């Protein structure tokens, strides 16, 4: 065997062993359940009847997760429920004002006043520092929860925000 062949064989063996090591680490971490589940848009409460937004999902790490409103809603939509999801950025979240005076609270009040026979459910999924890429991603999954409407209050972060001109991604 020539010197070049031995050299290439050794490089191949080192690369194979390195890859095998990384695969072993990955399998071990998965087997022991390390990390968090980022696949689901919503997480369940302990009793499994209610859902709430998984803020860490795909977009932010645990330390960077934005502080959205924690809105619980029934997993199964009730017969007499009118369900609206609100997607948006910090303005839709109500920032910088308290949650109880944000537009979805006022909308819920007005809808309950005009439709007293309906159970009005407005779930605000707004997060800071997101844009229409996130809205699109959320909306694809929201249709499975039988919304009667999806309100999108966004646009502020399209130009200067995530994946905009001010982004480094």
Question: Where are the model-predicted features located?
Answer:
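Membrane-helix interfacial "entry" motifs
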Residues: 2-11
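Hydrophobic membrane-insertion alpha-helices, especially the h-region
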Residues: 10-27
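Membrane/wall-proximal cationic-aromatic binding patches
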Residues: 32-110, 114-115
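Interaction-surface signature
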Residues: 35-44, 133-169
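Structural recognition of the beta-strand scaffold that forms the well-ordered cores
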Residues: 83-86, 121-126, 149-153
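Solvent-exposed loop/turn segments at secondary-structure junctions
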Residues: 90-93, 127-132, 156-160
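Mobile, glycine- and charge-enriched loop segments
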Residues: 104-107, 118-133
